[in-house]
Amino acid sequence: MCSQLWFLTDRRIREDYPQVQILRALRQRCSEQDVRFRAVLMDQIAVTIVGGHLGLQLNQKALTTFPDVVLVRVPTPSVQSDSDITVLRHLEKLGCRLVNRPQSILNCINKFWTFQELAGHGVPMPDTFSYGGHEDFSKMIDEAEPLGYPVVVKSTRGHRGKAVFLARDKHHLSDICHLIRHDVPYLFQKYVKESHGKDIRVVVVGGQVIGSMLRCSTDGRMQSNCSLGGVGVKCPLTEQGKQLAIQVSNILGMDFCGIDLLIMDDGSFVVCEANANVGFLAFDQACNLDVGGIIADYTMSLLPNRQTGKMAVLPGLSSPREKNEPDGCASAQGVAESVYTINSGSTSSESEPELGEIRDSSASTMGAPPSMLPEPGYNINNRIASELKLK
């Protein structure tokens, strides 16, 4: 019987760059490898239990067979456990292999839940406080006093650097309390001064680091997100950094994810966040990779009678220019060429038609395996100071 693969996403984000790239890559690979492919929107699905048996309806039609693998891309900050996760759990109960799994997505939709999962595993992370009630922010102003000032304040459901504040003192915290929405809790986190305005985004697929990008703020703010106007440049990662990112991915049960690492003065790292629905427009550009294609290759490897998940070779991309460059940090000129400023809400320049059944696709995707990332010894903070002038 022919294998079946679904790409499941949300109507609100279906035309964003990551979804368009993954969709094209999956369509091409499924067409070439005789795999039945279907692109599905979350609101097209109805889950059923009839006669004590689980069932599934798609566009009001009952299905008699179900996909072997489902690649999931849902807007993580707005994922609802009573709706979206219900559908994902149902698919999993039907025997579908989800990428990422429902529990893995839940581990990342709330920033404090992420730290709860990582706690007890020796993962370096900032001291963090949070609370249960929606109206308890003001109470936490005193409770979080041991964290000192300035203190980082984040919405547990924030994304893309939004709803993040650096409070100078208790009075500033009180002002923030009156300005924010209280529909979700906030967390209070110890400020990592040495990583102000910079971090490293690491993308992990199938338990392997496929690339890393240094992100830097250009306006002095604490957040370095490219969606807020920050810049990103390809950055070699030490073995310690790679192993930390892989450890976090494994603890959270992720098939693919983005891990954000804060940079300490001694060259070590502290985990800032994990992203189950990682965006990769800036990452693709800065690192000259095809993350959508890499995720598609990994997903295909999970189909029956294929590799069982672990990719033997990282299926990333590297240009001829990259292959001819020496190992180590890029020159100042190379850094300038690799830095991109990404505006919030950027999408692909080509709009994708309504998601539906697979059709022949003329879109081509690249697939040459890259060399492993170099691991030279270097001081990343000095690099930032001398080349990006941001320290």
UniProtKB/Swiss-Prot annotation:
UniProt: Mn(2+) 2 binding residues: 273, 275
Binding site residues for Mg(2+) 2? 273, 275
Gene Ontology MF, one: ATP binding
**Keywords noted in UniProt:** ATP-binding, Cytoplasm, Ligase, Magnesium, Manganese, Metal-binding, Nucleotide-binding, Phosphoprotein
| Chain residue ranges for the region called Disordered | 341-379
Q: Where does ATP bind?
A: 154, 189-199, 215
Protein name per Swiss-Prot or TrEMBL: N-acetylaspartylglutamate synthase A
Gene Ontology annotations of biological process type: glutamine family amino acid metabolic process; protein modification process
Residue ranges, compositional bias (Polar residues): 341-350
Q: Which residues form the ATP-grasp domain?
A: 115-300
Task performed by this protein: Catalyzes the synthesis of N-acetyl-L-aspartyl-L-glutamate (NAAG) and N-acetyl-L-aspartyl-L-glutamyl-L-glutamate.
Q: What is its EC number?
A: 6.3.2.41, 6.3.2.42
Catalysed reaction, written as an equation: N-acetyl-L-aspartate + L-glutamate + ATP = N-acetyl-L-aspartyl-L-glutamate + ADP + phosphate + H(+); N-acetyl-L-aspartate + 2 L-glutamate + 2 ATP = N-acetyl-L-aspartyl-L-glutamyl-L-glutamate + 2 ADP + 2 phosphate + 2 H(+)
Pfam families documented for this protein: RimK (PF08443)
